[in-house]
Amino acid sequence: MQADRSMKMGHVSNPLSTSAPVDATAGPNLIPDLITKIPWPRWILFIAILAAGVLLVSCLLCVICYCCHRQRHRKQPKDKETVGLGSARNSTTTHLVQPDVECLEPCSGGDQPWGQLLLSLEYDFGSQEIRVGLRQAKNLKAEGTADPYARVSVSTQAGRRHETKVHRGTLCPMFEETCCFLVPPAELPKATLKVQLLDFKRFSEHEPLGELQLPLGTVDLQHVLESWYQLGPPGSTESEQMGELCFSLRYVPSSGRLTVVILEARGLNPGLAEAYVKVQLILNQRKWKKNKTSSKKGTTNPYFNEAFVFLVPVSQLQSMDLVLAVWARGLQLLAEPVGKVLLGPRASGQPLQHWADMLAHARRPIAQWHHLRSPREVDRALALQPRLPLLRPRS
């Protein structure tokens, strides 16, 4: 019985003794056993594992980038050099590219509320001309940013002025433009140079930013002079007294159709009557095509809204000027020009910018307000050639 018991105990103990190594070897084979029990193909499992790994790495990278961005954003207000006009420079139109400038710090003290202007003056005694070099301006007074441009004139030359290009989104424009004015030596002591800084507005009145009035009699013009000048408060301009004209331009290169829409005028002299607008095309300094609007009576702000279409091939655009003139009857019965606007390749300032915008945005109407200029000034800039007489056949 003891033997039977021993045999039974041995028989019972053998399975226990053999089960221990089975459990020891089951650990390393656990993953292969699980893989074999899954009813999917192995390539699907490998793809799932790879996708999970890629997702995990992507989540880690996103967390790291978010932490770095927050840390950089916290440090940015402490660094003054990060202030810039990147978004404003991206809004530049056509060919106007504004150089990088770092002059947006507030003016020190209260003595410079209107900003400063760097100006160069040179007088040529041979040609009796004074050359005015507009270099740059800084710390202009405006809310946020502005689209400044400069307007230059001399008191002894009525109606003659020069306008620079418009510089977008900056308070420190770099002009780098030169203009000349005919001033005899005898008139230098009583001549005054006037430079106006204005903020360009396409559909409203241009906001003055500052003004410089420099008596030329107080300046030593024996040598080239270049220095900074303090801008003062702006005053009334001569063009504001003439009035303004709003019109749109549209050009289609494929058909050569130039559409001019005369919209309205404002600020005309109250003593004028029956105002209308003449539209004239000049080719190679000779009068080419023309048309005019209907007359508007009894108002200083006439509304026209009349369109005119001209056929102008692309090859003739560089030789063509567009002149819009406001005419009205004054004290005399005959109508006379009140003011004109010159557009085309020989224009300057806002009219040149309007012309460039029309060419840059073909098939799209571009509307804008323009200050009227003196008719004599525009005629002098055109330098029209006399018309050639028509040769009639002999009878």
Curated annotation (Swiss-Prot):
The chain crosses the membrane at residues 45-65. The keyword Kinase does not apply. Keywords: Cell membrane, Cytoplasmic vesicle, Membrane, Repeat, Signal-anchor, Transmembrane, Transmembrane helix. Residues 66-395 are cytoplasmic. Residues 113-229, 241-370 form the C2 domain. It is a single-pass type III membrane protein. Residues 1-44 are extracellular. GO terms for biological process: acrosome reaction; calcium-dependent activation of synaptic vesicle fusion; regulation of calcium ion-dependent exocytosis; regulation of synaptic vesicle exocytosis; vesicle-mediated transport. It holds the Pfam family C2. Belongs to the synaptotagmin family. Involved in the trafficking and exocytosis of secretory vesicles in non-neuronal tissues. Mediates Ca(2+)-regulation of exocytosis acrosomal reaction in sperm. May mediate Ca(2+)-regulation of exocytosis in insulin secreted cells. Homodimer or homooligomer. Homodimerization and homooligomerization do not depend on Ca(2+). Interacts with SYNCRIP isoform 2 C-terminus. Binds inositol 1,3,4,5-tetrakisphosphate (IP4). Binds to AP2 in a Ca(2+)-independent manner. Interacts with STX1A, STX1B and STX2; the interaction is Ca(2+)-dependent. This is Synaptotagmin-8. It comes from Rattus norvegicus (Rat). The gene is Syt8.
